[in-house]
Amino acid sequence: MGLPWYRVHTVVLNDPGRLIAVHIMHTALVSGWAGSMALYELAVFDPSDPILDPMWRQGMFVIPFMTRLGIKDSWGGWSITGETGSNPGIWSYEGVAGAHIVFSGLCFLAAIWHWVYWDLDVFCDSRTGKPSLDLPKIFGIHLFLSGAACFGFGAFHVTGLYGPGIWVSDPYGLTGKIQPVNPAWGAEGFDPFVPGGIASHHIAAGILGILAGLFHLSVRPPQRLYKGLRMGNIETVLSSSIAAVFFAAFIVAGTMWYGSATTPIELFGPTRYQWDQGYFQQEIDRRVRAGLAENLSLSEAWSKIPEKLAFYDYIGNNPAKGGLFRAGAMDNGDGIAVGWLGHPIFKDKNGHELFVRRMPTFFETFPVVLVDEEGIVKADVPFRRAESKYSVEQVGVTVEFYGGELDGVSFGDPAIVKKYARRAQLGEIFELDRATLKSDGVFRSSPRGWFTFGHATFALLFFFGHIWHGARTLFRDVFAGIDPDLDAQVEFGAFQKLGDPTTKRQVV
């Protein structure tokens, strides 16, 4: 019988051999994409400036995931940390990409083999000779194997016992490096920003998975539960698998968008909440005050601020500033950052310090307003000059830079002061090269934004898929008129559909 496009997957419904084949082919496609994408990113990635042009500014998507798992060197002689001439051995970025492509090829061949040799003895019950799969037993096997892999990752790879460790950094994303991590078994292990929780949770979840797998291998489900949850129906497996996947997708969308130890800002860029809360601005202010307390001059205190920290405190690195349909890397938007101009301090003609009010995340334009330390408006760039009372010219605002390339330089020309006031709305001021990439000046999101949007969207779609297939398997007799206890293999390509005269409906 002919199948409409949206029902073509039913051809593998009662065909375990070809069900395996299509899943292996899917793995081949996923692995092949990952390896190919890694090679493409490596071809276009510029590792020369890890401070002002890091991977996330360049739109790298798979390189950050390799890096957080312990890969940091290239066969090209560069390292993500800025070192040169290192010898990474086989596990370089290119080595990982090549391994994925080789694995993809092997999966491709295995998929073809399983498609051709689909009617294997292992799929038949030796006592009856009828096709049958022991799905609870298969569940136990998969649970045991995934538990073992989970435990191995936490106990060996993350801890450095047999592996490199993972990417660990400080709260401000300045000192990140690959290092072994000790498991955190106390309450701190539940803090999403504590790397030790990654090790301890993988170890604990792995042990639980191994024990649960052994349980399901050794204990049969009660008949009432087996029938009630349709454990003999492969669509039950599909439904529960989709549930696991959409749940995981929602979780990682959250850990990516809100930030966690698994999504370091050095690899994926800052989160929008760090801009909203003035996170880096407060740390910079704390460091400057500490410098002044040590009798440093204002210029010396600002000059000690790491350029990396200042760059985080710039709205162009906020992943929520890029529209969902603005394709391309951050560098294609506001340009490639070249250097920090320094911190501008504005003063009125009486010498009182003024502060530019920063632009909130969801504004494209925002009035230029300068306030005093009590938050009272003292100067602005007016929309209507005729009614202006607080214009830069009237208030006599000047600006002087501390730290950065313009350290010690001051400006009194109102046009220049207004230019830097507008730029100070966006955080620390950087020189940006828009010519090299023909950047259009419109902000882009970082890989953090793309990952979150993609996973949240697919999680929602998969949630509906879980409901759909769960309902189909639980109410198969209602929807298709097929006895739920029917376990006979039916004609190839004609499965369990309403109005299909070839599908057997009753057990007897």
Curated annotation (Swiss-Prot):
Q: Where's it found, cell-wise?
A: Plastid, Chloroplast thylakoid membrane
Query: In what way does this protein cross or attach to the membrane?
Result: Multi-pass membrane protein
Q: Which domain of life is it from?
A: Eukaryota
One GO BP on record is: photosynthetic electron transport in photosystem II
* Gene Ontology MF terms in the entry: chlorophyll binding; electron transporter, transferring electrons within the cyclic electron transport pathway of photosynthesis activity
Q: How does it assemble?
A: PSII is composed of 1 copy each of membrane proteins PsbA, PsbB, PsbC, PsbD, PsbE, PsbF, PsbH, PsbI, PsbJ, PsbK, PsbL, PsbM, PsbT, PsbX, PsbY, PsbZ, Psb30/Ycf12, at least 3 peripheral proteins of the oxygen-evolving complex and a large number of cofactors. It forms dimeric complexes.
Q: Which HAMAP family match?
A: PSII_PsbB_CP47 (MF_01495)
Protein's recorded name: Photosystem II CP47 reaction center protein
Organism from which the protein derives: Cryptomeria japonica (Japanese cedar)
Q: What is the lineage of its organism?
A: Eukaryota, Viridiplantae, Streptophyta, Embryophyta, Tracheophyta
